[in-house]
Structures are given as structure tokens and as C-alpha cells.
Amino acid sequence: MRNVSMTQRISEVVRNTNETKIRVRLNLDGTGQGTLNTGVPFLDHMIDQIKRHGLFDIDIHCDGDLEIDDHHTVEDCGITLGQAFAQALGDKKGLRRYGHFYAPLDEALSRVVVDLSGRPGLFMDIPFTRARIGTFDVDLFSEFFQGFVNHALMTLHIDNLKGKNSHHQIESVFKALARALRMACEIDPRAENTIASTKGSL
């Protein structure tokens, strides 16, 4: 019998285009370690929330065309991280599949719900109070999340329920995402060799 809990769930993805060159290494059963170097400091800060609060080991290195703007780097990092999750999850046997979490950060409160369904879908409502956080264009978060869900093959609901500070709004989202992903990616010891779907596949 296959013991899923003892299987290494580790992936490494390299994605090279004319716009970005990215390498991602992911361990789903880590301790929140890793080095992030996307070239966009605020994106590093947000992915660090996934790493630390999800207890995923994540290494990302990206060389992107930042002389143009951050768009390609942010979107492509989402794509490549999504590919790494899909690869590390493998056949999805034993997964809890669903995860949800509410995360506060001072006045901000966000809810994230994850379904590792195999069906990409992003449903996102973040009423940002300003257009930029420092130099970072908040519109790019939808590009990151869309790339992530499309390639991780998951359904993702993101709702910022309260918030006045845009930094707090998005950081609470990433913290909630981290915990929801952690829950969804965990192995259910009572169902180690089954798929959490009546179809028998995800």
C-alpha cells in the first residue's frame, strides 16, 4: 500500500521566455524556509507570507524585464509557482482538497477559500483603497493570482472583508491564502489512498 504521508512532495520548475527566466523549487511538507528573489521586493514580501504561514519551503529566482515594468515578472512568477504546486501535488491522492481561512491584519480582514478541484477559477474581491503600494501597482495582484490558479489547477475565492490600508488588505489576503493552501494540501490520514471526489479524479 502506498504511504502518501511518507512520499516527498517536492517540485522544481524552470520557465524561460523572452520576458522572464524563472526557477521555482517547492516542498509542500516544509517548515517555511527558502530564498525569494523575484526582483520585485513587494512581491517577495507577499510570497514570503505563503512560505512562512503555509509552512511551504519555496525558492524563487527570477530575471525579468523590469526595465519595462513589473507586469511580466509578477504574472510569470504566479504562473511558475502554480506549476510547481500542480507538480508537487501529483495524483492528489489523500489530499484534504479544501481549505479556508480568515486572516486579520490590524483593521483589515480577509477570507480565502481554496478547492484543489483541477478546475481553474479565480473569484476575487479586494476593494483597494489606493492604486499603488509604494511603487507596486495593485492591479498586478489579479495577474499574479490568475496565473497561479490557471496553472495550479485550483478554484480560489478571495474576499477582503474590511480594510483601510492597502498594504494591510493584501497582506491579510496572502496570509489567509497561505493557511487555506496549507489546509487543502494536507494529507488526510483516514483517506491516504483515495481521491476526494465522487468522480475518482481531480
Curated annotation (Swiss-Prot):
Residue spans crossing the bilayer = none
Q: Where found?
A: Cytoplasm
Per UniProt, the enzyme's principal EC class comes to lyase
**Which Gene Ontology CC terms are recorded?**
cytoplasm
- Superkingdom per UniProt: Bacteria
Q: In which pathway does it act?
A: Amino-acid biosynthesis; L-histidine biosynthesis; L-histidine from 5-phospho-alpha-D-ribose 1-diphosphate: step 6/9
- Tell me the keywords, alphabetical order: Amino-acid biosynthesis, Cytoplasm, Histidine biosynthesis, Lyase
InterPro entries in alphabetical order: IGPD_sf, ImidazoleglycerolP_deHydtase, ImidazoleglycerP_deHydtase_CS, Ribosomal_Su5_D2-typ_SF
Keyword field contains Hydrolase: no
Location, primary (coarse class): cytoplasm
Q: Which CDD domains match?
A: IGPD
The Swiss-Prot or TrEMBL record annotates one GO molecular function as: imidazoleglycerol-phosphate dehydratase activity
Report the PROSITE patterns cross-referenced here: IGP_DEHYDRATASE_1 (PS00954), IGP_DEHYDRATASE_2 (PS00955)
Record EC number: 4.2.1.19
BP GO annotations: L-histidine biosynthetic process
Homology family: Belongs to the imidazoleglycerol-phosphate dehydratase family.
Record's protein name: Imidazoleglycerol-phosphate dehydratase
According to its UniProt entry, this protein's organism is Acinetobacter baumannii (strain AYE)
